[in-house]
Design a protein with these regions (language model features):
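Boundary at the C-terminal end of the N-terminal hydrophobic targeting segment
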Residues: 23-25
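Gly/Ser-rich catalytic/binding loops embedded in alpha/beta enzyme cores
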Residues: 27-209, 227, 247
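Ligand-binding "clamshell"
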Residues: 219-225
């Protein structure tokens, strides 16, 4: 039994995640990387946005088949990183997330990428119809305006309809990198697994009834469920858009979660519920 392929594969992946996340050819420790450390490294010229993005993409390529965190990847991530490097050289950092690789849950719009909400009917690859937005969700646009690089869109149960497991009709089952026999939490389990497995520095999840808190608890992350109206819901596929749906950050440390919340919070004319938060920001 000890020599069975499944045991060896699982054991090797778990051991790999316990080791420092140094990647051959990039020399960047991804496991403990923070937004502050990234900005310090960029300022010191230790590496570039392209270097960092390549490192994360290499790690995803190496381990994603085991954990299944993603529904889709952003094919333009490296091009965006290159443009951010040019911008950095000419005018400095765009914001606190300049060149920071992040992920978003696949019920949030990203211009040009399919939004499935985990449902096979919103994917031509599964026999449905692709839903391709022309604009970013408000929270996603704010991440990008702050310099973040969206690496991909993460798995979720169909229509974010489960709070313990993350199993979609589009991408199947997402696993928990800490223990693949345990649930990753849901419905933002894909984002939690991506951050936990060091596929990204941080990510966005959504919550209606525990969907940020549950996977954050299951995977030892800092997840923030904001007050309704603090973060715009424009461009997010709703479960209950009346007063309980929220978008929030998921990260490995409090600082990164707080910085991200500061970036995505605030009013927008496309979501009038956000104007109630103006005096509380």
């Amino acid at each position: 039994m000890m020599n069975s392929p499944s045991f060896v594969s699982i054991a090797s992946v778990l051991l790999a995640l316990l080791r420092p996340g140094m990647l051959v050819g990039q020399g960047i420790d991804l496991v403990e990387l923070t937004t502050e450390a990234i900005q310090e490294a960029y300022a010191a010229g230790e590496y570039t946005s392209v270097d960092l993005t390549k490192a994360f993409l290499e790690r995803i390529d190496r381990y994603e088949d085991y954990y299944n965190a993603f529904i889709s990847m952003n094919p333009k991530a490296l091009d965006i990183a290159a443009r951010l490097d040019e911008e950095y050289r000419s005018s400095g950092p765009r914001g606190p997330l300049h060149g920071v690789p992040v992920v978003i849950k696949d019920n949030m719009d990203y211009s040009g990428l399919v939004t499935t909400a985990g449902f096979w009917g919103f994917s031509t690859a599964m026999g449905g119809i692709d839903m391709i937005p022309s604009d970013d969700a408000a929270a996603v646009e704010r991440l990008r305006d702050a310099g973040a690089i969206i690496l991909g869109k993460t798995n979720l149960p169909d229509f974010a309809g489960h709070g313990t497991r993350t199993n979609s009709s589009v991408a199947g089952v997402t696993l928990n990198p800490y223990n693949v026999t345990k649930a990753p939490g849901g419905s933002s389990g894909g984002t939690a697994t991506a951050v936990n497995a060091s596929f990204a520095v941080l990510g966005l999840g959504t919550e209606t009834g525990g969907s940020i808190q549950n996977p954050s608890s299951a995977q030892a992350l800092v997840g923030v469920k904001p007050t309704y109206g603090l973060v715009p819901l424009e461009g997010v596929y709703p479960i209950n858009g009346s007063y309980v749906d929220v978008v929030g950050p998921m990260a490995k440390n409090v600082y990164d979660a707080a910085v991200t919340l500061d970036i995505i919070a605030g009013p927008t004319t496309d979501d009038f519920a956000t104007f109630a938060a103006v005096d509380h920001i």
